Amino acid sequence: MTSVPIVRRVLGDGPFAEIGEPALAVIDDRSRMVAVGGDLGAVQWNGTGTADSRWTGHRIGVYERDALRCRHLVRSWYPVRSLAFHPVLPLLAVGTGRYDGGYSFEGELLLIHLDSRNVVSALQHPREVLSVEWRSETALRLVLAPCDDWENPHAHEQGHTAVVTRADWGAVEQRAIGAEELAAPAEPAVQPDHSAETRRLLADLADAAGQQWSGRRRVWAVEGMEDGRVLAALDGVLAESWLPSGDRQWAVEDEEGGRQLVLASDGTSVWANAERRSRRKGRHWETSAPRLARIAIDAGQVLETLSPGVCAVLITGGQRTILRPMDGGSKRPARLMMYDLDSTVDGPEVGRYDLFNHGFAVRSASRPYVLVGTDLDKPHKDKWIAAVGADGTLRRLFPHSWVPQEHRFGGPAVEIGQSLVYAGTVHHGHGLQPGGAYVVRRSLNGAVQWQYRTDHPATALDADEDTVYVAYNSGALTALDADNGSVRWHTELEVGGAPTTAPSLAVAPQGHLLVGTVDGRILECSLRR
């Protein structure tokens, strides 16, 4: 196994990056620590959704108050509701939880040991913990949401207050607090939103440390240029450019942010595709107009904007700009939209698009590739990998699944020679199963050259002449031998000792690896041979 890559530079770094969008924070004057709860968000967008299986973006970060260095970073399956440092012990109590959307209020009481980094989930049964407060060294006051809202229209405004005592909270074991200790009558409970004051607090703490808090999140696309510049698309930014010096050259802002970057055929500009989600405005849901813009790489000037009328995904490969509509609610089979410098033409019918079945972004594509169903009225079934010819015709190459009767979801891909390497997951009625995520290399006649199985879905992949690089939503980064699929190296992504996850990666022309992280940073990694 060869050496793992080394992070030699971090672009877009800043304090509190690890926790994403902050929800609340508390300062402990005794230990001079700051605890922050936040959310990195999902690792899916309207163009692709399979990477969100087994993912949670909820985080608890514990930072040094003076230097703002992240000392601990803990994943939570539920949003963070409350934080409280123990008055004496190196222990942080965290209340988490949410309503499941139909019946139950679920969550955990987490006890984070700041000396050993052990995390204890202390409740015997899942309960949303709205508030935690230390009354003394031995007494912890909890406010818990009702178990459910069955025949209780006031459940969302109620809480059950209980005081749990332990002689030594540092010795509490997993699932040690039973339901009998939490039994209490329901009372009105206020659930304030602390996000605005938390943002102000983090900005003030950063300013006091001589730093700036920016709140960057989720780098969805990253590309390296021949001259050493780095392009990226991320939340709130349609596209940005970083100079070889490490300074940000320009940025084009957007209400949602860019999700795709595709270098234009002229070599001097890049196409950027923005996310558009429905948002409630008053009593109605509204969706902003799609935004697909071509941006000059040198100056960041928006040169043109396409108006497809519906949200679409950019399809790479070839000289034309090709869009695949994402209007999944339409009853008509969708067609590709093909643009060149002088005109727009309708492409072949490809069926309706959904983010789980049809995501198939192919890097280094010599021609456009899409996933299409054999029945355009049921496009998610019996999908084939198809190529779009120069004349706009669609040629089916081989079935997406090489196992008969097995349904597979889409994922990232790369073309290597006369073959495609692509990642995905296998459908199962009970969700993603162990070994249900894969990377496979197949010849253009459909023959399987090799496959590599894992438990977590891939978020991104790319390749050079002999290695396939795969990022997973678990935070893993794996290099596979392009010839036989064996593991060259495997590592867990970290920045400053704190784990992170990569929604995007790209092999730069200079040979190093660019990794876009879920917390808004771009890692430049050297690949030692």
Protein language model regions, located:
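Blade-level signature of beta-propeller repeat domains, shared across WD40, Kelch, NHL, RCC1
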Residues: 143-170, 497-529
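Residue-level signature of beta-propeller blades and closely related beta-rich strand-turn architectures
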Residues: 39-40, 97-99, 146-148, 236, ...
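Hydrophobic beta-strand positions that form the internal "hydrophobic ladder"
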Residues: 33-34, 92, 140-142, 230-231, ...
